């Protein structure tokens, strides 16, 4: 035989080895007509040359592989793994051993595995000696290398290394393939003799066992200590997500999961890692925008305008996570390539069947098995890459989520006051809950989006290969239809932007409502608050969702039609212009390609929508991050030294400083053209020309009327009010303004900021527990008696904002926090206003005086209290934002100015010392003050301190006594950020009554009843229509495919395109009907079902929450409630509907798919049923796992929101105490916990996906195998039917995976409904109105109040706060209510308004039992000026009269009576952004003034006193009420304003019954009667005169302690 014939026989042409060339496996013998005899000749040449690639098949018509070809593959495999193992062996040997590594004994599994590997070496060597084949030399070398590597890895690697895992798996698969041929073919590969065959079987089993031991039982020979979890996971476990199996088994067994059960698989997805990346990239982006590029410079030159480039958050994120973006895109491209390989493989498979049916010489059956195997392996490779792509994209999403959440939170803690005003807490919460979630969900499809252009190009190229130029007909159709669909999608942009703003506004309003729940109940304002919320939610937000839904339905119709239009146009053009029949091998691969084409086509609209959403969200976040911060040094004008200045007597110095409300306004200062002097608008000036100093060890007091600037000065010293920057035109001789502080600062705000924690945690506030000084602190702050009354003492959990505490208790806890820090400078803002007079007197003595606990520190006190002024070293009188008088106490009294008159007028009433007495007292030696001015406890403490000083001085010398005395009151040490204070207590194990209530989490499957309630809320009639329409669409789709199958078979049989007009016309008609039904279903589900359901649940939950008793707000963090109104509502608005739609569609598709397969391949029933058992095994484990993880995630998110909201509200306190890092650490810890849950949950999804896609690929594989098997039977499957069936079998992967995933998502969405329904069914207060028990309109006509054996408690398990109260308050009687802290004064108010309900007895008003009438009728007919004055982010008018019942004249009148008219007249606010956009001439919009002026969130543009006066104005409006309750109503105002208010009350409420709870006993001295409460009981009830006559009375002792009697 000549050389050329030899080459032809061996099949050297590389073209013949092409995967897609059908001739590669049909052998070239067919082409030359070579018979079996020649094939035998060929076999003689199989191993004749070592330089040629042998044929894969032994003969063109036989079903056996060529042994030479198999051996060549084996050699290549051995060579590859030998190199791979050698590389890893070298790496392990060069890796330095850890010195601290602890080695363990060798386990039996390791010994057995080594023995098996050694056996494998012997077996391979035996095969070599039996076969004398050089192939086995490579096998021996590879196995020996594996043996060495097994020995080394045991002591060096924590996991089974990759080369060994892959080698043994590949070796097992290869040996199995050889075993199959050796068992069923006469053309042997290894087993040319009986012993060789036995050794082959043993080698196969042995190789498999080694693999099992390596992958499942590997344990390193040392203890794993500091390795990250993922570093202990081997390759197979990582790619199959097997490392989650223990967790899944645990949840399946217990139906429960805790955070501690989760494996720590975060890796680098922690806040610290991710935030650092984004922060760095954002800083670079900010620098980039400050330096315009070439294009910007050219454009600026051409237009003569400055180009302002905004920093782009997207660019910063892209730069920070470039590696993850690149990996995600690469994996998406791989998935795309493998996906497009499937249609070509299907075509090869169908062509094999066609050749088998219509060719004379039938190809070997092994070729069919080959293509079935290749399709299976391609599918496996596809889903492995697919799941890794998903994992990467979700990891990217979580990295962005954690980084942005941390950045936003840290930014919120640094915002300037003006920025905080522009960006309310609700907006910031929305950025975290809404915007970041939108970005996160965009990331998980990012790879798909970015790979879409590639998919489109590859798909068109593939279609061109099938249809040639006819493809362009489809392309032209797409070009015509796609822009229309794109325009429809683009039209949603405006709606989405508005939707996000509506969500912001709704969240802000809900936050305000929750914060002001008690006031809303006092005023019975539930109805107007719900009306405001309903307007934003139903009329605006849901209306936008409805518009988006209608447009989405139209877009869905258009995009679903595009692939159909393309297929129609392509088929029609091909049939008309090309004389080639549309056979199954063209039609069904084309259908698969059209489906693949629909993916990028369908992704385009969602991509456009999501890009709009994401760009909006990123822009909003970027805008937040660009907001102004108030720098600590304020451009160098503020200097802070953390240590006292030993060379100066001053601790605080403010020189020539003017402070402004807004830096923005300051930056927009107008310039007078002539004088060129810049001025700050008067409305922006907060304080002007301030010169102030405070010395070490002295008390400086700042006094003034309400709104004069006392609190502003305190905040200015803190650095929270911007200092006015001198203009360039200022005279250089003018002094430069400055604020200097020397030493650490403690701040006690006027409105105490209390954490939702224990009392002890609030006092220690991140500092180390010092039992001795802690006891001194609580004693000095008068808290010991409170601790005795609180349910758990200082371990009592106080609730959100300290809601379970009285105003006085909150004030004293806040003061104790400041005192405990042992700071150098104390900034105290009106701390005495909320405490009783006798308590205030003790605090002055024990804390504020020079002999007090912080007497040797600098104290700056803004106050309206006159008694404390006697202790002051300096007194400043402030009015209109400027100091008008200043001096020491003696100087002020001698000057006899306004300040002296104030002191004389109000001071003499309280038995305060005269000027002479003060002078005399001030000359007395301090030692006597020590002995006479302190309680026994305090004296004992001081003696201990003196003894300690003496002891230390003995060692260091008398010359250092001063230093020692200063050092004794040392600064408090901080604890670690994660410190648990409960561990500091010896009794931390005892049962607490007020522990933090964990958010309830139900267990088990979400019941069908939950979904039933949702469907009923959505209107089941419309829902049924949608299901029917969807089912029709699925059936029509099956009909379309069968029509094409039937037509293509006719074309094959007749070798011509049969009746194209009829078949394509029918196909087009079915497509149009399907598209129309799709549109109608989408329109109905979005326009009617979803909006209706969302309206129902939000309305019901809002009403249920607002109608809940006050105990619900006491025990439930606001963040937890907000989570229901933001995340959970967001899920039922958008996520859950899509999930339900997808589930119904997928379920119906599944029924049809299995029906089609079983109709033509009945034997598949055995395979499908068997695999469905496996499928169910995974399903029943996955569903509880994802459900419980979702519940855990929902619970984990609430603390994140609660912590962020809580700390944003207390940002001034956090900043003052330098506690930012601690709160950031706490938030990071919570974010990382939430992220871990999310990462585990998504990896569990991948765990399921890997297994279900294996099942799906197996179904496809067995379908193909059974189809090949039918070729040897009586009824072989036709190529057209094969294409029809395989098209459906290839979709099983998607269907099965989607069914479980979507069902799990439905369960997760069901959890959201479950949580909402839980809040829809909260225990409610009594009915607002009881129709048959409504009192008369004139009730109460007299205002007689009777308590009859009345008792009450705040909650069922707590002790009573009022016990058997028995008293009568007559009509028009003025009753003052006093008592020590915790006596029950405020509880009496709550009882009267039925904020808390009776546990015994009742209250009657004018003979009507208040427990028998509706709450609206009760509260609406009572009037209160509450202790906590709440305002809403609305106009002055809406804050006064939310019902709109009164005229403007009436509103102005009550403002005048409340002494607010002047201030409100001057108020002005800019129009909102919405109003500007709605106006044609936004620049011409005037500012809102007077009643229309806006009150900002939390009343930030009003002082505390002004907010109290606003409450007085509200009370003055209610003229019909005959009962007025004043709950410490004038605590926050100065004495002059208090006098005016008291006079207003006497004149305007003279015909009303008045109950006054007051700290200042002088304000109730003119009351008709005094009610003294003690431990919740009536201790005394008589006229003040009679009570003062009795020196044994409690009232007498209170008056004496407060200095009101001689």
UniProtKB/Swiss-Prot annotation:
It comes from Candida albicans (strain SC5314 / ATCC MYA-2876). Residues 326-613, 1042-1308 form the ABC transmembrane type-1 domain. The lineage of its organism: Eukaryota, Fungi, Dikarya, Ascomycota, Saccharomycotina. Keywords: ATP-binding, Membrane, Nucleotide-binding, Repeat, Transmembrane, Transmembrane helix, Transport, Vacuole, Virulence. This is Multiple drug resistance-associated protein-like transporter 1. Residues 923-941 have a biased composition (Basic and acidic residues). The keyword Amino-acid biosynthesis does not apply. Residues 672-905, 1345-1600 form the ABC transporter domain. Residues 908-941, 1465-1487 are annotated as: Disordered. Pfam families: ABC_membrane, ABC_tran. The keyword Lyase does not apply. ATP binds at residues 704-711, 1379-1386. Its main location: membrane. Belongs to the ABC transporter superfamily. Disruption phenotype: Leads to decreased sublethal intraperitoneal infection in mice. Induction: Is 10-fold down-regulated during log phase and strongly induced at the diauxic shift. Expression remains high during the postdiauxic phase and continues into stationary phase. Is also up-regulated during the presence of cadmium ions.
